[in-house]
Amino acid sequence: MRLPYRNKKVTLWVLFGIIVITMFLFKFTELRPTCLFKVDAANELSSQMVRVEKYLTDDNQRVYSYNREMPLIFIGGVPRSGTTLMRAMLDAHPDVRCGQETRVIPRILQLRSHWLKSEKESLRLQEAGITKEVMNSAIAQFCLEIIAKHGEPAPRLCNKDPLTLKMGSYVIELFPNAKFLFMVRDGRATVHSIISRKVTITGFDLSSYRQCMQKWNHAIEVMHEQCRDIGKDRCMMVYYEQLVLHPEEWMRKILKFLDVPWNDAVLHHEEFINKPNGVPLSKVERSSDQVIKPVNLEAMSKWVGQIPGDVVRDMADIAPMLSVLGYDPYANPPDYGKPDAWVQDNTSKLKANRMLWESKAKQVLQMSSSEDDNTNTIINNSNNKDNNNNQYTINKIIPEQHSRQRQHVQQQHLQQQQQQHLQQQQHQRQQQQQQREEESESEREAEPDREQQLLHQKPKDVITIKQLPLAGSNNNNINNNINNNNNNNNIMEDPMADT
């Protein structure tokens, strides 16, 4: 049966309405699922409080996300083992940002370790509902915020807190895709650097080479075990000596291990010191004056001849980890290998221009200090000048820069002389003040005797003054005697007035 035209029209409108309503309901439920479906309030609240994905934006408005699953880079090892050089070379890469050492993360990890070792603290946490998962999540978020926020955003984030590796297995538990670079250096060179530069490390007695070697042996043993437990796919041992002797070969291995593309900038980190998105330095890091230089051999064998004879004799027993790591405990110095030609050339040029590099180190540290004092304007101006000029090289030294360097050194020398003069004056004042105090103290001790003398003298003076009128003397003689008596009293009181 055929429907009339009017009925067909109504039917089409009804079908159209059904389609529109269906599409509206579908879209509405997609945007507002909680309106049609019951959602657990606790889960909803937790999802709002804990954001899995976080974002950072750089100066070019590029957005970077960071979370616990990201491939973080951790540089570990005993302090003074080349960790600062390693992070400076990585910082020169445009895709990597390490930044300065904070020491925050290892302290947080040590605090957590203390809680777990203490039965009292562990019980208190359990009773408070702080489970292992809650603790791990909180520590991971805290560490992630420190790593992500203490420098500029970058595709790959890195942290250089050497002692973090002592808890490397737990760090991998927090960040399963993270990787470690384990910096290894001859323990004799490390200990000599710690002692000569007076680097304070908990447990190290800087007055004893023997004790410091024992502490180094224990620390490196713990880190070596941690790296072995983490596995070769997550922890790579990097020998400082080989990195210095063959920088390009080892940096290619390191970047391949980290899944970071090759960039020649990592071989010239000194050109990016304190530049925007470059290699920031800190005035409190002990290696800042060294990493401003290109890769060189200066620090390779400074320890030779500096260690006491009895410690050298017992070295194999004091530090057995030397042999485990492949170092000869009886060789002074060991044969580390032959350096690349350009590294040897860098070393020769540094020796020829030692005063210039020392002056440059002072300038860089002063710039870092001014950053801490919020004088960023001065730093930006100096960076602009560096960018406008040709890049500094060792082979070519711009005369203007050389004269400025010389003037700066002269000014510093004059300031040091003035400071020494002021210190000498202050020392003299202190000696004079001390001498006055000693004199005043002796005067105080002698005061009772003097008071008794005055008491005995005063009656005689009174008798003399009374007897003068009886003898018919004039008033002038009386006044003179009175004035003489007053002068005697003043002489007795002057020393006490100085006090």
From Swiss-Prot:
Membrane-spanning intervals of the chain: 10-30
Membrane topology type: Single-pass type II membrane protein
GO cellular component, one term: Golgi apparatus
Residues on Cytoplasmic side: 1-9
Binding site for 3'-phosphoadenylyl sulfate: 80-84, 185, 193, 197, 240, 287-296, 302
Disulfide bond positions: C98-C158, C227-C235
Residues linked to a glycan: N346, N380
Keywords, comma-separated and alphabetical: Disulfide bond, Glycoprotein, Golgi apparatus, Membrane, Signal-anchor, Transferase, Transmembrane, Transmembrane helix
Compositional bias annotation for Low complexity: 375-400, 408-434, 476-491
Pfam families referenced in this protein's UniProt entry, alphabetically: Sulfotransfer_3
Homology family: Belongs to the protein sulfotransferase family.
Name by which UniProt lists this protein: Protein-tyrosine sulfotransferase
Name of the gene this protein is made from: Tpst
